[in-house]
A protein has these predicted regions:
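Positively charged, helix-rich recognition surfaces that bind polyanionic ligands
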Residues: 1-135
Length: 135
C-alpha cells in the first residue's frame, strides 16, 4: 500500500509542478488572459469522457495559479461568463448561429469558415477586453 501511495503522491507532485511551470510561463508572456468561466462540476457530471478524468486534470487549480500569478505581476485575469455564446458568434461579422457540439467547423454567411474553437477563443478575448474596459 505504501508503494501505491508513493506513486500517487509522485503523480500529484508532477502535475502540480507542471501546472506551476505552465501558469508561470503564461503569466510572464501575456499582460491579459481571458478565460471562459466553465462549470467544471457540471461538465464532469454530464460525462464528457470520464467524469473523474475531468476533475483529475487540475483545470481549476491551474486557473487559480494563473490568476494569482498574473495579479502578482500587475497583469489582468478576466473571466467571461459561462453563458456567453462564444462558439455561436462569428468573430468577423457578429452574427449568431446555433451549432451542435459535433460541428467543429464554423461557417458564416459573411464568408468566414474556420475552426469553431478558434472562433470561440477570439470571441472570449474580445468579450474579456470589453469587460476589462468597463471596469
Amino acid at each position: 500500500m505504501r508503494k501505491v501511495n508513493r506513486i500517487y503522491r509522485k503523480i500529484a507532485n508532477q502535475r502540480l509542478d507542471s501546472l506551476h511551470k505552465k501558469s508561470t510561463e503564461i503569466a510572464n508572456q501575456y499582460g491579459i488572459v481571458c478565460v471562459e468561466d466553465l462549470d467544471m462540476k457540471a461538465i464532469g457530471n454530464k460525462g464528457f469522457g470520464n467524469g473523474k478524468a475531468t476533475f483529475d486534470n487540475g483545470y481549476g487549480m491551474f486557473l487559480n495559479m494563473l490568476e494569482y500569478k498574473l495579479k502578482e505581476r500587475g497583469k489582468y485575469f478576466v473571466k467571461v461568463g459561462k453563458w456567453y455564446p462564444s462558439s455561436q458568434i462569428c468573430h468577423c461579422c457578429g452574427s449568431v448561429k446555433k451549432f451542435d457540439l459535433k460541428d467543429r467547423v464554423y461557417t458564416c454567411d459573411c464568408g468566414y469558415i474556420g475552426d469553431r474553437d478558434h472562433n470561440a477563443a477570439i470571441n472570449i478575448l474580445t468579450e474579456g477586453l470589453r469587460i476589462l474596459q468597463s471596469l
